[in-house]
Swiss-Prot record:
The protein, known as: Cyclic pyranopterin monophosphate synthase
Function noted in UniProt: Catalyzes the conversion of (8S)-3',8-cyclo-7,8-dihydroguanosine 5'-triphosphate to cyclic pyranopterin monophosphate (cPMP).
Residues the record marks as active site: 128
Protein keywords: Lyase, Molybdenum cofactor biosynthesis
Disulfide bonds: none
GO biological process: Mo-molybdopterin cofactor biosynthetic process
NCBIfam families: moaC (TIGR00581), PRK09364.1 (NF006870)
Taxonomic source organism: Aliivibrio fischeri (strain ATCC 700601 / ES114) (Vibrio fischeri)
Oligomeric form and interacting partners: Homohexamer; trimer of dimers.
Amino acid sequence: MSNFTHINASGEANMVDVSAKQETVREARAEAFVHMAPETLELIVSGSHHKGDVFATARIAGIQAAKKTWDLIPLCHPLLLSKVEVQLEAIEAENMVRIESVCKLAGKTGVEMEALTAASVAALTIYDMCKAVQKDMVIGQVRLLEKTGGKSGHFKADA
């Protein structure tokens, strides 16, 4: 169990001590997808959804979620994010929305969880706003795309 940084020798979960780490610029990108019926996607794309602009609401929800990750994930550090960006793209040929988030900071710990949380909550917001017209939407393929900075260096997911 000692390979997990959040688990001590006794098997207890603790927040990692990052006080001795170097401050570096760190960035992470994540993605999520929401699969839906063509009619649901058309409501979003055309802007005719009765609840308003689904993409704008999901974008703001994702940004807010990134800033609150430390409140949601028990062992995450509160971070002073310098950038949070959430992009949403309708992929009509596949009846889905792709969400990509980017989080950045200069700090002692990474922003992977913030990027993943932003993408996830944006996807959940799309579901919430559209569930009245379709309940069988599928949220999936949430993953880290890339991260830079820090001791572990650069990571890029396979395409």
